[in-house]
């Protein structure tokens, strides 16, 4: 009989890949953007605008908020189409940073001066999840805000527009 211990299998450390981490952050950003707009009154639509980010990333593609062409009766407004490189969809705000319910009937509703024009795109959050009674379930994701880049952080419940 040998006194040598049996060889054991090496345990490999399983760390999330870069793609996995990126994918997770995209989902978090999308949820936060859509949730903020739903709270502001655009139940199944997301109030968004195009924006160039310092990183040069195209968040319109990254966060799956791609605009869709819709007929005038199918939704609040027409989509301007696909965004170019370094452009992003971002929650757009009125003077207080909230989506403007009055703009629901307008395509490219004007926002605050210098902010640009907003469009309305279909949200992927179910209507039930956007209702006031379910807001508490989304508030639990608040710690994710610290992980997001500056422009995506919320100030007093609304998106910063700077």
Curated annotation (Swiss-Prot):
Alphabetical GO biological process terms: viral translational frameshifting
Chief subcellular location: host cell
GO cellular component, one term: host cell perinuclear region of cytoplasm
Signal sequence coordinates: none
Residue ranges, compositional bias (Polar residues): 13-23
Record keywords: Host cytoplasm
Highest rank taxon of the organism: Viruses
Subcellular locations according to the entry: Host cytoplasm; Host cytoplasm, Host perinuclear region
A GO MF term: structural molecule activity
Region called Disordered, residue ranges: 1-23
Note: This protein is very unstable.
Protein name: F protein
Source organism (scientific name): Hepatitis C virus genotype 1a (isolate 1) (HCV)
High-level lineage: Viruses, Riboviria, Orthornavirae, Kitrinoviricota, Flasuviricetes
């Amino acid at each position: 009989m040998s006194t040598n211990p049996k060889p054991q299998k090496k345990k490999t450390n399983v760390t999330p890949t870069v793609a996995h981490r990126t994918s997770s952050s995209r989902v978090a950003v999308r949820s936060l953007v859509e949730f903020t707009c739903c709270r502001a009154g655009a139940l199944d639509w997301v109030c968004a605008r195009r924006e160039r980010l310092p990183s040069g990333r195209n968040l319109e593609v990254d966060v799956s908020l791609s605009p869709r062409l819709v007929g005038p009766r199918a939704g609040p407004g027409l989509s301007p189409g696909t965004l170019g490189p370094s452009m992003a969809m971002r929650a757009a705000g009125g003077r207080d940073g909230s989506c403007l319910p009055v703009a629901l009937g307008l395509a490219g509703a004007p926002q605050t001066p210098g902010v640009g024009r907003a469009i309305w795109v279909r949200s992927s959050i179910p209507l039930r999840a956007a209702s006031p009674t379910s807001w508490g379930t989304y508030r639990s994701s608040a710690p994710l805000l610290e992980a997001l880049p500056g422009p995506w952080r919320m100030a007093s419940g609304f998106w910063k527009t700077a």
